[in-house]
Swiss-Prot record:
Homodimer. Heterotetramer of two MnmE and two MnmG subunits. Its main location: cytoplasm. FAD binds at residues 12-17. The gene is mnmG. This is tRNA uridine 5-carboxymethylaminomethyl modification enzyme MnmG. One of its GO terms (biological process) is tRNA methylation. One of its GO terms (molecular function) is flavin adenine dinucleotide binding. One of its GO terms (cellular component) is cytosol.
């Protein structure tokens, strides 16, 4: 069978659980991954894609930390796009369309090749907790397995309830049963629980679609990739997606089913994701819009199954079908399966520490949708961080926390712990106040050394990052030292409608002009030779351009981050008594008592805590 004592047990093998198990095992902890179905490891339950706005940055951060999501996203990709390329580098976000079946298979194979990792297929029905400390899990068959740390990554399975029109039934995902027992155990020891909702669109037969009535959405001409490692290569061929629109006719058909919609008849009370609303929610909330975009996404290289992005719904199946048949290109559509909504239990994340360990039960960690987030990438990064900290706790080493100025992962976890969430939380670039520092191109600079010190990133990765960093810095310095005369620069400046130079200047300064590109700079004497002699690749050249163009913004954000970190270093004593600080607002006292922030900086980010409250706190702490 398997051993009965582990360092770390991970409950659930979705995106969070898979990264948690990989991190803990790769750090040397004897790890057991328990899932209800070993054939469904790392399933893409919703859209067949990884990355996107802010999410792509997270995948690159996971990769820089030695996680598997970036590598698997590359090996299973069918299309690559760098989103927001017309904006500044802080907004660039990589995204891949994925082969759903290959994604899950590649994840399974990566995990099977990971040392210190065992697998078991069973439902975990309870947690074994003694003296406010988790010591193991109990399965539905009554088997008890013990561990020093447990990571719960239950996804949408905790008391999951699926809705299609006026039909509802228990399930954690289409065709899979819900998980029961854990919520009851956690409430009994004092946890607060809530319910959330998410939804998914119909899957259809691509052979029944008329793509000539849609707009093709190809991948990038020169595709990139997620992983910084040499383990993966950019795509040599790609599959296109397509775009079409709903219409007033489609909306009218959908409205016919509103009286049977669980969203509108009160059957679903939970809050769904604000930024991924159902089609019925969209036409209800945005009644002035006569059409909505639909993205038609292939599910893989060889399958005919297609995902209808933008048509998430829990309306009756007959209404879904009739409405889709009125969409341009879908006149003869055949369904593979209808869309549905699912309600599930979650635990407000203010009950966690920044390590993702629960405050109530020692050694118990939560990651993913159990914390109120939505999205594969958000789940995966939490899983990785929970797995790292679960392993560190077992090894009696210092905890690992990423700050808001160090990673989007740090922003996400800090938001959850200090602000909580009452609706499914997803990441956006706008949530990160230091997004110029947290770009997708420099995640390796920010995180690889930290990961290497944890024992996750390999020596090879570390050397590769150092070479990229050294060579790009050397190129920046070369451009600062190199002068260019007006006779050489002005023809280039004139072509770009940039004002001419009157005297010699440094290439760095000329390059700083917004109109001037790296291709222009290569025309100046010595630049091409420097690139060739120093064997600079495209990544190093791009890094140099960003450092030159955005040096002012980067410096400003670094200074702001340094100020924040001074507050981050001001620790608040554990179990600090806020009730005696009468000059602080009542709301602030209540919020601080509930969240119990570890630092003054965290306290300042809690909703309802004003700058004046922080000043009072600092005085009270004798600062």
């Amino acid at each position: 069978m398997f051993e009965k004592q582990y360092d770390v047990i991970v409950v659930g093998a979705g995106h969070a659980g898979s990264e948690a198990a990989a991190a803990a095992a790769n750090m040397g902890s004897k790890t057991l991954l328990i899932t209800m179905n070993l054939q469904n490891i790392a399933q893409m339950s919703c859209n067949p894609a990884m990355g996107g706005i802010a999410k792509g940055q997270i995948v690159r951060e996971i990769d820089a930390m030695g996680g598997y999501s970036g590598i698997v996203s590359d090996t299973s990709a069918i299309q690559f796009k760098m989103l927001n390329k017309s904006k500044g580098p802080a907004m660039w976000s990589p995204r891949v369309q994925s082969d759903r079946m290959r994604f899950a298979e590649d994840w399974r194979l990566k995990l099977e090749g990971t040392p210190n990792l065992d697998f078991y297929q069973e439902m975990v029905a309870g947690l074994i907790i003694e003296n406010d400390k988790v010591i193991g899990v109990r399965t539905s068959l009554g088997l008890e397995v013990f561990a020093k740390s447990v990571v719960c990554t239950n996804g949408t399975f905790l008391n999951g309830l699926i809705h299609i029109g006026d039909k509802q039934f228990g399930g954690g995902r289409a065709g899979e049963r819900a998980a029961t027992g854990i919520t009851k155990d956690l409430i009994e020891v004092g946890f607060e629980a809530g319910r959330m909702k998410t939804g998914t669109p119909p899957r259809v037969d691509g052979r029944s679609l008329d793509y000539s009535k849609m707009t093709e959405q190809p991948g990038d001409d020169i595709p990139g990739k997620f992983s910084y490692s040499d383990e993966t290569k950019p795509l040599s061929k790609q599959r296109s997606c397509h775009m079409t629109y709903t219409s007033n006719e489609v909306h009218d058909i959908l409205k016919e089913g509103f009286d049977r919609s669980p969203m509108f008849n009160g059957r679903i009370q939970s809050i769904g994701p604000r930024y991924c609303p159902s089609i019925e929610d969209k036409i209800n909330r945005f009644a002035d819009k006569d059409r909505h975009q639909l993205f038609v996404e292939p599910e893989g290289w060889n399958t005919v199954e297609v995902y209808v992005n933008g048509f998430s719904t829990s309306l009756p199946e007959d209404v879904q079908f009739k409405a889709l048949r009125s969409v341009a290109g879908f006149e003869n559509v055949k369904f593979f399966r209808p869309g549905y909504a699912i309600e599930y239990d979650y635990f407000p994340p203010t009950q966690l520490k920044h390590t993702l360990e629960t405050k109530l039960v020692e050694g118990l960690y939560f990651a993913g949708q159990i914390n109120g987030t939505t999205g594969y990438e958000e789940a995966a990064c939490q899983g990785m961080m929970a797995g790292i900290n679960a392993a560190l706790k077992v090894q009696e080493k210092d905890e690992f926390i990423l700050k808001r100025n160090e990673a989007y992962i740090g922003v996400l976890i800090d938001d959850l712990i200090t602000k909580g969430t009452e609706e499914p939380y997803r990441m956006f670039t706008s949530r990160a106040e230091y997004r110029t520092l947290l770009r997708q191109d420099n995640a390796d600079f920010r995180l690889t050394e930290r990961s290497y010190n944890l024992g996750l990133a390999s020596e090879k990765r570390m050397r590769k990052m150092e070479e990229k960093k050294d060579k790009s810095l050397k190129f920046v310095q070369y451009l600062k030292d190199l002068s260019v005369v007006p006779e050489e620069a002005n023809p280039v400046l004139e072509k770009r409608n940039s004002s001419p130079m009157k005297q010699s200047d440094k290439v760095f300064k000329v390059f700083s002009r917004p109109q001037i590109t790296m291709e222009d700079v290569k025309n100046f004497s010595g630049v091409e030779e420097f690139i060739s002699e120093n064997e600079l690749n495209e990544e190093m050249i791009e890094q140099t351009e960003i450092q030159v163009k955005y040096s002012g913004y980067i410096e400003k954000e670094k200074n702001n981050a340094d100020k924040l970190n001074r507050l981050e270093d001001m620790k608040i004593p554990k179990n600090f008594d806020y009730s005696n600080i009468k000059s602080m607002s009542y709301e602030a006292r209540e919020k601080l008592k509930k969240v119990q922030p570890a630092t003054v900086s965290q306290a300042s980010r809690i909703s309802g805590v004003s700058p004046n409250d922080i000043s009072v706190l600092l005085v009270y702490m004798g600062r």
